């Protein structure tokens, strides 16, 4: 099981939001590349990057910061936020992103996901962000009538590498992962699922492991790592023994 440390980029800085609200951003590091290096040095094997401005504007905004991170690390990175077309997907893959995450565009234009998976097999993930069980888009500003399961089912045969499932109501709030919903999703589909939103402590990871769900690839942690509530060495040691 993989623990992905999150670097959320706003105005070139490494921040954390609460419930996805841009006006509730806490700056944790004004040098994202240094933060990424620190995560690699701590033993993490895969980094999760989000261009927050890009998610709201529908196009890459923090490209310079992302490129500086990619230049600074030797471990793989996955990137989401503002990726709405094939040209942007191709650009990021060529620049060294291992896996591109399609969020809003996956909901509004599912054909893009299918085409991208065909063109770049194993390199495309879908980000499904839920508010009250419904899929939210446009940087979480719009909530649709679709359930996460409805949406995930559309990509069952597309060749999606992973689904990143975020519970917005918990994101950045340290309320604990929504393990029940994550397990339900992972059990219902064949695509690997990554849990995100609310991870608060090592206890969350223990509960995730205890759920014994083979469809869960890992979890994303942001604020708990920055706040020191989750010790990297303890967490990584726990997860390394789990397939």
From Swiss-Prot:
Pathway: Amino-acid biosynthesis; L-histidine biosynthesis; L-histidine from 5-phospho-alpha-D-ribose 1-diphosphate: step 4/9. One of its GO terms (molecular function) is 1-(5-phosphoribosyl)-5-[(5-phosphoribosylamino)methylideneamino]imidazole-4-carboxamide isomerase activity. The gene is hisA. GO terms for biological process: L-histidine biosynthetic process; L-tryptophan biosynthetic process. The active site is at residues 8, 129. Gene3D superfamilies: Aldolase class I (3.20.20.70). Its EC number is 5.3.1.16. This is 1-(5-phosphoribosyl)-5-[(5-phosphoribosylamino)methylideneamino] imidazole-4-carboxamide isomerase. It is found in: Cytoplasm. It catalyses: 1-(5-phospho-beta-D-ribosyl)-5-[(5-phospho-beta-D-ribosylamino)methylideneamino]imidazole-4-carboxamide = 5-[(5-phospho-1-deoxy-D-ribulos-1-ylimino)methylamino]-1-(5-phospho-beta-D-ribosyl)imidazole-4-carboxamide. Coiled coil: none annotated. Keywords: Amino-acid biosynthesis, Cytoplasm, Histidine biosynthesis, Isomerase. CDD domains: HisA (cd04732). It is an enzyme of class 5 (isomerase). Belongs to the HisA/HisF family. GO terms for cellular component: cytoplasm.
């Amino acid at each position: 099981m993989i623990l992905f440390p999150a670097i959320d980029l706003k105005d070139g800085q490494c921040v954390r939001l609460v419930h996805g609200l841009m006006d509730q951003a806490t700056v944790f590091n004004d040098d994202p590349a240094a933060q990424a290096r620190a995560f690699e040095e701590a033993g993490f094997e895969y980094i999760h990057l989000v261009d927050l401005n890009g998610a709201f504007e529908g196009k890459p905004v923090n490209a310079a910061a992302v490129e500086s991170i990619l230049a600074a690390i030797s471990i793989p990175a996955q990137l989401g936020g503002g990726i709405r077309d094939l040209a942007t997907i191709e650009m990021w893959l060529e620049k060294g992103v291992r896996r591109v995450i399609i969020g809003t565009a996956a909901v509004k234009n599912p054909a893009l996901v299918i085409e991208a998976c065909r063109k770049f097999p194993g390199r495309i993930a879908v980000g499904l962000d839920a508010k009250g069980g419904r899929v939210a888009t446009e940087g979480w500003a719009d909530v649709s009538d679709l359930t996460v399961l409805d949406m995930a089912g559309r990509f069952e045969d597309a060749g999606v590498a992973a689904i990143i499932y975020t519970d917005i109501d918990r994101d950045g709030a340290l309320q604990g992962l929504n393990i029940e919903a994550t397990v339900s999703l992972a059990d219902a589909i064949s695509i690997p699922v990554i849990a995100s939103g609310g991870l608060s402590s090592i206890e969350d990871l223990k509960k995730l492991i205890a759920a014994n769900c083979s469809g869960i690839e890992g979890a994303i942690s942001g604020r708990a790592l920055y706040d020191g509530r989750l010790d990297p060495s303890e967490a990584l040691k726990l997860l390394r023994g789990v397939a």
